Design a protein with these regions (language model features):
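SAM-dependent methyltransferase catalytic region
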Residues: 171, 185, 189-430
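Nucleic-acid nuclease catalytic cores
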Residues: 1-4, 97
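Preference for the N-terminal adenyl/adenosyl cofactor-binding alpha/beta module
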Residues: 11-250, 275, 279-285, 292, ...
Length: 430
């Protein structure tokens, strides 16, 4: 046609065509992965899974056997009220990618989507339920192809070497978390900023942990600090458990130094696994954190059994809803998780609260519960013009911690926050 016309037709949809070519050629695997290149490859595929596959599945509402839509309904009804399809697609895609990553860290042999289920610890009930479908279920073809491809990337990568490289480069003692930061920055930096998801530097965590430990000893007469078996600890914005992992390590080392290794296993079982609590809203860091605690306790000679779990719950800290039980296949642990989290919020006495809550003035957290208890901080500033500043998530987390400590009457908080409350009149009530 071009020869007959003796002219070239005008270029149309050039950007879309280039984008298609980029996606096509980018799915070839490099021979050797660094942490950076692995994060990039996983991020590209996870973004594709979210935007081109899960989104499409969620729009197919006429398909009665659509399990992805069923999972969305279950998450919305039994875990995170008000969850949008867009947020679920993001949550679900990251869950699959990091669930595969978590499984891959537990084997040096051949790895695939179908084998992943065998390497998901039974203590992470929700993740185990998700992978019962991902690994063993009948997936939509386009979903199967992209998840198989993510598994192939992980199979080709030397995960142990990549994580060790973080140690060698002086990035600290938390390589899994540093890798997640790299992944998230490549995958969706905007969501990272909106959610206030940033890694907490280890020296800051050390400082706060040691400070709270001293306060427990001097002001609360807890001779062994965090190692006192009647001390309860909560991180309300657990993330990847940077704070509680350090606190647990600190407590175990203190206990061992003072009482020897003989009772250490029992100390971990009866104190660390019973009196340390955390909440997290995003499922990828939730999965990573469970993996991280399993590795940490393993370092101290404690192998987690099928009946053990660290008390980190997938929940919105600033929301308290009495949710009914679900019998949706593969989602049995979802309603149980919600139930356990609500019990901790309402009834579990907590003495020490530490963490790095999100900072976002455009807060997504507007539940009836948090808006009601924030009224206490607004009483003194009703005539202020800039009261919107009190809607920042970090202020709401401070109020939750305050409310939680009020249940007992005494307590200590060690939080990383913005400093706006120090010199802004809108925070007088706070």
């Amino acid at each position: 046609i071009a020869r007959k016309l003796k002219t070239l037709p005008p270029v149309e949809n050039e950007n879309e065509f280039r984008s298609l070519l980029d996606k096509f050629f980018s799915f070839s695997l490099p021979k050797v992965f660094s942490a950076e290149t692995l994060a990039i490859e996983l991020a590209k595929r996870t973004r594709f899974l979210k935007e081109e596959v899960i989104h499409q599945e969620l729009e197919d509402e006429e398909n009665n056997s659509n399990q992805v839509l069923g999972f969305y309904d279950a998450f919305q009804k039994y875990l995170i009220a008000g969850l949008t399809k867009e947020d679920f697609a993001d949550l679900y895609a990251q869950t699959i990618a990091y669930g595969l990553f978590a499984a891959r860290t537990r084997t040096d042999g051949e790895f695939s989507r179908r084998l992943a289920y065998n390497f998901i610890p039974p203590t992470i009930g929700i993740l185990k339920d998700v992978f019962q479908f991902i690994s063993l279920g009948s997936l939509p073809q386009q979903m199967e192809v992209i998840i198989d491809d993510i598994a192939a990337v992980l199979n080709a990568a030397d995960i142990s070497k990549i994580l060790q490289d973080y140690y060698k480069k002086g990035k600290g003692q938390d390589p899994i978390i540093h890798f997640y930061e790299t992944f998230l920055n490549k995958y969706d930096p905007k969501t990272r900023e909106q959610r206030g998801v940033y890694y907490t530097p280890e020296p800051v965590v050390d400082y706060i942990t040691h400070s709270v430990n001293e306060i427990l000893k001097t002001d609360f007469d807890k001779e062994d600090g965090f190692a006192n078996t009647d001390v309860t600890v909560l991180d309300p914005a657990g993330g990847t458990l940077t704070f509680l992992a350090q606190t647990a390590k600190f407590a175990i080392e203190d206990f061992t130094e003072k009482y020897g290794e003989g009772h250490r296993t029992n100390f971990i079982k009866e104190h660390i696994l019973k009196n340390f609590f955390a909440f997290e809203l995003m499922m990828a860091p939730y999965a990573i954190a469970h993996l991280k605690m399993s590795f940490l306790l393993d370092e101290f000679g404690y192998k987690m059994k099928d009946t053990d779990r660290f008390k980190l719950y997938l929940t919105n800290t600033l929301e308290i809803e009495d949710l009914e039980q679900t019998r949706i296949p593969g989602m049995a642990s979802l309603s149980e998780e919600s139930k356990q989290a609500t019990l901790v919020k309402r009834k579990q006495p907590i003495l020490a609260i530490m963490g790095n809550p999100p900072y976002s003035i455009a807060s997504y957290n507007k539940s009836v519960f948090i808006e009601e208890i924030m009224g206490l901080y607004k009483e003194d500033v009703k005539d202020e013009k800039n009261i919107q500043l009190l809607s920042d998530d970090y202020a709401k987390f401070i109020r939750f911690c305050h409310w939680k400590i009020e249940q007992v009457g005494v307590g200590v908080m060690g939080l990383i926050t913005k400093n706006t409350y120090l010199n802004t009149s809108a925070f007088k009530g706070l």
